[in-house]
Design a protein with these regions (language model features):
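Small cysteine-rich, disulfide-bonded extracellular modules of the LU/uPAR three-finger superfamily
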Residues: 1-83, 90-214, 221-266
């Protein structure tokens, strides 16, 4: 199967309990017989690993992309076949160490151990180890990686953007998007189940005529616009673009698997 994320791990990322910059992230080698399961949550559920898990050294998070030095596992005893790599947060206890990413599309895998040294190179493309991609703003993704946005507990709001708004990957805080239409609404009944962010539809009430809504923006409201980080620009909303005419507007989120957005590949 393709590289993917563990839904339970992504729940923790969305809940702000993973700080990829300061937490001890490690990589473990799994045998070819390991079967990925969406229900796996902790290292203890993975079964046996090959060799000793290694920490990710010299981690960087730039534009929502996690990278680190290539892995060096040293000499590994012969007789095993490495089928995949799992990234996890090491709490010091395998029963509470959450698994985050499952990688089986890695250069050199599968690999039969023969007593020699094993090194695992990371992808040098745009994804590196893992990437939080659109519709998330890169700067917002950096804050998600750092655990500074808790989608369950923080004040997450949605604002309407005019069709003239031009997405810019450098946009970081609410003033960067310019004027919004109407009054931003708090997202109610939020969930992060399985690494998928969802909420109740947002009711903006009656909006004055004369504007055209092209997209919506999610942000964390800190109480000060200049420090309220942008999270995502969502264009795939039913009914958009929409010309306001004085009537009411309810933003309806997708009923598809990704809902508002998902950290688990489709």
């Amino acid at each position: 199967m393709a590289n993917t994320s563990y839904p339970k791990g992504m729940e923790k990322l969305l809940s702000g309990s993973i700080n990829a910059s300061t937490d001890t992230l490690k990589a473990a080698l799994l045998p070819s017989g390991y079967a990925f399961s969406v229900s796996h949550e902790f290292v203890s559920q993975l079964g046996s690993i090959i060799g000793t898990a290694q920490p990710l050294l010299n981690k960087t998070i730039t534009g929502g992309v996690l990278d680190a030095d290539d892995l060096d596992f040293g000499a590994l005893a012969p007789g095993s076949t490495i089928g995949s790599v799992v990234i996890f947060k090491d709490t010091g206890n395998t029963s509470t160490s959450p698994v985050l990413f499952f990688l089986d599309t890695v250069t050199g895998l599968p690999m039969a151990t023969n007593g020699g040294a094993v090194t695992i190179p990371w992808d040098n493309g745009v994804k590196k180890i893992a990437r939080i991609n659109l519709p998330i703003y890169p700067k917002g993704a950096e804050k998600m990686w750092a655990g500074s946005i808790n989608f369950s507990a923080d004040d997450i709001k949605v604002a309407l953007l005019p069709s003239s708004y031009v997405y810019d990957a450098a946009h970081e805080f609410l003033p960067d998007v310019g004027a919004v239409i109407g009054t931003a609404q708090a997202l109610a009944s939020r969930t992060v189940t399985g690494g998928v962010f969802d909420a109740a539809d947002a009711n903006f009430g009656a909006l004055a005529s004369g504007s055209t809504i092209g997209s919506v923006v999610l942000y964390k409201d800190t109480g000060t616009a200049a420090t309220s980080p942008l999270i995502a620009c969502v264009t795939d909303v039913l009914g958009l673009p929409l010309a306001t005419n004085g009537g009411g507007l309810v933003v309806q989120w997708s009923n598809g698997a990704a809902r508002i957005f998902s950290l688990v590949p489709a």
